[in-house]
Curated annotation (Swiss-Prot):
Keywords attached to this entry: Cytoplasm, DNA damage, DNA repair, Hydrolase
Name of protein: Uracil-DNA glycosylase
Family stated for the protein in its record: Belongs to the uracil-DNA glycosylase (UDG) superfamily. UNG family.
Catalytic activity, EC: 3.2.2.27
Amino acid sequence: MKPFLNDSWWAVMKSEFEQPYYQELREWMKEEYRTQTVFPKPDDVYRALHLTSYEEVKVVILGQDPYHGPGQAHGLSFSVQPGVKHPPSLRNIFQELKDDLGCPVPNHGSLVSWAEQGVLLLNTVLTVRKGEANSHKGKGWERVTDRVIDALNERDQPVVFVLWGRHAQNKKERIDQNKHYIIESPHPSPFSARNGFFGSRPFSKVNAYLKQMGTEEINWCIQDIE
């Protein structure tokens, strides 16, 4: 079964999907979906790699694992489906976006418009059990998403990596900083946002770098849904 992702990513990831560890992960995941409530739904697991093709990635915003509440996760880091209340981290992201670029806080929490402009919203672990944060940690997803990061690092075209919090910053060693650009700050979670996430202006920093590279900037402001 081919994972539901963009053809350009399929070409990049195909050999990874043939590895024995991935076959084990797949079998384990089948059993998890059969016996547990798991988020996101199977078709959305690779949504980040479906909406943003390999060649078009300009920015990576690295998350940890999906939201574990009903109806929240849909395969994009920090993003929630329309109609779902903004989780605390996303609320803080929107607050910083407003302070940084003056973007009004949207009436929904879907970041699909970012993904469609080349922002890869990647969690390092792609699934989670309902109500159990980090429940799928250490099962093999980290190897999959490390390969995604490595593939982007191999590209000649520069990528901006946005690393919020220690978990994301642990991936720094995989990134060639002579070629790519890293923006880091504390995590937007309520536990750490006041320790340096607020006021860090990541969105304008990303755009300044893209402009310097001669690349089209991201329109970070998100339209309300009627």
